[in-house]
UniProtKB/Swiss-Prot annotation:
Any one cellular-component term (Gene Ontology): cytosol
Gene that produces this protein: miaB
All residue ranges annotated as the Radical SAM core domain in the record: 188-430
Record protein name field: tRNA-2-methylthio-N(6)-dimethylallyladenosine synthase
Residues covered by the MTTase N-terminal domain: 48-165
Binding note for cofactor: Binds 2 [4Fe-4S] clusters. One cluster is coordinated with 3 cysteines and an exchangeable S-adenosyl-L-methionine.
Organism lineage string: Bacteria, Pseudomonadati, Pseudomonadota, Gammaproteobacteria, Lysobacterales
A UniProt-annotated Pfam family: UPF0004
Amino acid sequence: MTGTSNIPTHGKEHKDAPALLPLPAPNPHHTHAAHPGNPSHDRPPSRGKLFIKTHGCQMNEYDSAKMADVLTTTEALELTDNPEEADIILINTCSIREKAQEKVFSQLGRWRALKTSGRDVIIGVGGCVASQEGEAIVKRAPYVDLVFGPQTLHRLPDMIRARREQNRPQVDIRFPEIEKFDHLPTPRAEGPSAFVSIMEGCSKYCSFCVVPYTRGEEVSRPFEDVLTEIAHLATQGVREINLLGQNVNAYRGAMDPGPSNNTNPAPPPYADLGLLIRAIAQFESIGRIRFTTSHPLEFSDSLVEAYRDVPQLANHLHLPVQSGSDRILSAMKRGYTALEFKSKIRKLRAVRPDISISSDFIIGFPGESDTDFQKTMQLIEDIGFDQSFSFIYSRRPGTPASNLEDHTPDEIKRTRLEHLQKHINTYAADISKRMIGTVQTVLVEGPSKKNPNELTGKTENMRPVNFPGHPRLIGQFIDVHITEALSNSLRGRVHTN
């Protein structure tokens, strides 16, 4: 196991992905929803304005986009960036940490005044806080009109109508399996990169985590449904697919058995993530595939083989380890040891030696000793993690870990966190510096936010790159020669042979 990641370079060779399955054609009965703000002869006149505030993970970003799709399509609402002019205000919440949850009620308090402005403003709370708190939100903030969970966002039009007709708050936080995907409008692209949710929930029940209680057990979307959504996105110019799930590599998508005989045996009853990735790679226009977030327990040999065989699979893996101490990992109920985690990384680097590995770390879990923390630091040195996320443990009510005694002073936790972040940032900065002079494949996403005269995109290892270039390059994969490494991004120039 090496202590530092190798640098991804242009032109790596992988075996061609085998042709496996015919791709489904887009459902002709679906209608394409126009992008809000773009003129469309099929869209009725706006019946009001919609504001959505999103907290939390990429799954929440995806769900917020689906809320917008539902309400702009079925209710003819127009998206706005200004809550003060909105007729419907939604906040999509996160409950992973206590601080994030309290932000929700602070935000709701600021919006309360809009209810007394003389307009019939509807305020809704969605996401994981909604699932966890339910009707308690309305009791604490009686001016809230809607409370809905991640699995019931497709019911927003009905909830809005019921609120107006019955003049009382509506709460729906059930877990109706995967039903919501059957009621969502056709996906629409908002750039060359798109998120696609392939599963919901988590069944691992880590002792510190609320996700199984707020998003339910693991439920996978059918294999063909996922490919149909990607087919729609591909026709709209999407070049990069980001597969989403709370435990995305636990994906088990049901497959249509179809006819079988001696020459054409029946496919397996379900597709795992490795098989799904191979199928997505058959779309000629999809040049890059990513997935997040993963659990080490589900990091299978099938997925390692996909990294070996599928060049479109990005040369980056985010695999949350949380701790390097076996004692703490056991208390977290993670189901693996530090050695088993390193073994999985060793297998992956055997087929992708230059892959970038990022992770998540929880510092100050109840009972964490100096020895436990030093084992985490040793794991960081052994793996050579790239850019990663790290947080001080946040006690969440209802989780098993919330009952554990914790005698570690907050100051020690903060010192440990700073020490860990300093080391990971040093590794990440070293990787960025060693990318100078290399040629990286970049998907051009659009104009740079800091300089609209430049373009921006991301490398395979998730580093933003800013460079001069013509707008016609947007949406294309191009080679960029890296010339400078900054603290949070790279600079470069278009590479010409």
